[in-house]
């Protein structure tokens, strides 16, 4: 309806770890680009922010409730004992919001989350984040915004899935393209 050509990535094609998702984004940029705008939500937004730091060309990002600081967020949500058990066993089962089935996540995911949770971005970026997000705290996006002069944030009365705010996408894209 907006007349946009969209390339949708299978983010887990190379694995669940964040570094694998970063690889997926870089492959798309290298093989299918150039793109006018790179857009991702939650872990996809975090993967895009990490992927673009290696590129000097002018890339534009729209990130929807990006999972910045995911190591700290998950650690707080599951607690020290479960975190220790996950590290010891090497795998943990989660039931992601909106999914029909459980997902088993390797501990290497958390190792990546610690290393890649706060990327440096030198590309024009707009973040859309809901004030009611109960998955990724909005404060994570605020901290990220303060770390770069290239980042703006739009805060909305919405949750993590941003279902009530998708009509803003056209404006967000305009913000990074203007």
State the predicted function of each range.
Residues 1-32, 160:
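Active-site catalytic motif of lipid deacylating hydrolases and related acyltransferases
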Residues 10, 42, 131:
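Nucleotide-sugar donor-binding loop of glycosyltransferases
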Residues 21, 25-29, 48, 169-176:
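Generic hydrophobic alpha-helical segments
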Residues 32, 55, 148:
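Acidic-histidine catalytic/liganding microenvironments
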Residues 37, 58-178:
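The alpha/beta-hydrolase serine catalytic core
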Residues 39-48:
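Gly/Ala-rich beta-loop-alpha elbow adjacent to hydrolase catalytic centers
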Residues 50-54, 143:
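Active-site signature of alpha/beta-hydrolase-fold catalytic machinery across serine-
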């Amino acid at each position: 309806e907006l007349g946009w050509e969209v390339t949708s990535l299978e983010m887990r094609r190379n694995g669940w770890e964040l570094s694998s998702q970063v690889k997926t984004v870089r492959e798309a940029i290298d093989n299918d680009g150039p793109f006018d705008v790179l857009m991702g939500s939650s872990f996809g937004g975090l993967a895009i922010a990490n992927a673009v730091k290696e590129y000097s060309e002018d890339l534009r990002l729209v990130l929807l409730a990006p999972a910045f600081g995911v190591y700290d967020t998950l650690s707080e949500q599951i607690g020290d004992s479960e975190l220790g058990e996950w590290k010891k066993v090497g795998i943990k089962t989660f039931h992601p919001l909106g999914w029909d089935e459980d997902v088993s996540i390797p501990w290497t995911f958390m190792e990546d989350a610690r290393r890649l949770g706060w990327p440096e971005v030198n590309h024009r970026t707009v973040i859309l984040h809901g004030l009611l997000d109960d998955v990724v705290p909005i404060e994570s996006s605020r901290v990220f915004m303060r770390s770069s002069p290239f980042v703006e944030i739009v805060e909305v009365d919405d949750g993590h899935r941003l279902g009530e705010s998708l009509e803003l996408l056209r404006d967000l894209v305009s913000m990074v393209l203007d």
